[in-house]
């Protein structure tokens, strides 16, 4: 009897460990499935809506330029910033849109994505009167929801890199905004690999936001464009 009791006591921790291994393996599998489904869904739905030629972009919509930092981590000019400015200016000068809504981060002192992008667009010949700033576009999800709920836009042309545009277009679809996108030039090499991994995770976070229809960090009063 004593020997059997000792075996039971020794066996219990093993069963618990096996149980936790199963739980952890299940959670990891669900996480991987969520990442894969989110990415496949976004890429599939946005197919044919991301344009590289201004002639294929629908006319008359407000262009939503998604913000990014003017400077990189080492203080150099951020290529993504330059490429997005070039794309937004090109789109404007093509006559496809008469207004540009710049949505970016301005939550800390000395960091102002919308202002930096406005100044760069003005330097490219875009009139200041055609530019509207959204200082609370802390995330792509926030930018898309605020474009509709705060700035009253039901149709948009999103301007950013292709991988970013895909996610923005899917968010637009889910919140009831008709949208196409104009792809800015992208980078190549190791940076692209790192951003691809980050984008996979961002799309998973997006799926959670859309599942619960979270509100942006800030909404506030409506602003007419």
State where each predicted segment sits:
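Active-site-proximal helix/loop capping residues that flank conserved catalytic or ligand/cofactor
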Residues: 31-34, 86, 202
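Short linear elements at protein peripheries
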Residues: 214-225
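A transmembrane-helix-recognition feature enriched in membrane-embedded lipid enzymes
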Residues: 193-215
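Acidic/proline-rich low-complexity IDRs
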Residues: 6, 26-29, 90, 218
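Structural motif marking the loop-to-transmembrane transition
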Residues: 16-21, 189, 193, 197-200
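N-terminal type II signal-anchor transmembrane helix
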Residues: 8-55
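N-terminal targeting leaders characterized by basic, low-complexity, disordered sequences
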Residues: 1-4
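A structural signal for short, hydrophobic/glycine-enriched beta-strand patches
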Residues: 40-196
């Amino acid at each position: 009897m004593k020997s059997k009791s000792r075996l039971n006591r020794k066996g219990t921790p093993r069963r618990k460990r096996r149980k936790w291994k199963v739980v952890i393996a299940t959670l990891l599998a669900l996480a991987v499935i969520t990442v894969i489904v989110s990415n496949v869904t976004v890429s599939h739905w946005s197919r044919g809506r991301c344009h590289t030629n201004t002639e294929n972009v629908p006319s008359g919509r407000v262009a939503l330029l998604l913000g990014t930092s003017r400077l990189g981590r080492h203080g150099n000019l951020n290529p993504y910033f330059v490429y997005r400015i070039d794309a937004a200016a090109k789109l404007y000068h093509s006559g496809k849109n008469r207004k540009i809504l710049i949505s970016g981060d301005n939550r800390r002192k000395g960091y102002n994505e919308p202002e930096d992008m406005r100044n760069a667009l003005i330097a490219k010949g875009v009139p200041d009167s055609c530019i509207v700033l959204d200082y609370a576009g802390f995330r792509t999800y926030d930018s898309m929801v605020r474009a509709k709920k705060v700035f009253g836009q039901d149709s948009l042309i999103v301007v950013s890199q292709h991988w970013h545009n895909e996610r923005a277009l899917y968010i637009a679809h889910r919140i009831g905004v008709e949208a196409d996108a104009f792809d800015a030039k992208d980078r190549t090499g190791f940076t692209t690999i790192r951003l691809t991994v980050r984008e996979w995770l961002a799309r998973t976070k997006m799926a959670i936001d859309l599942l619960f229809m979270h509100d942006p960090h800030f909404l506030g009063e409506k602003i007419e464009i």
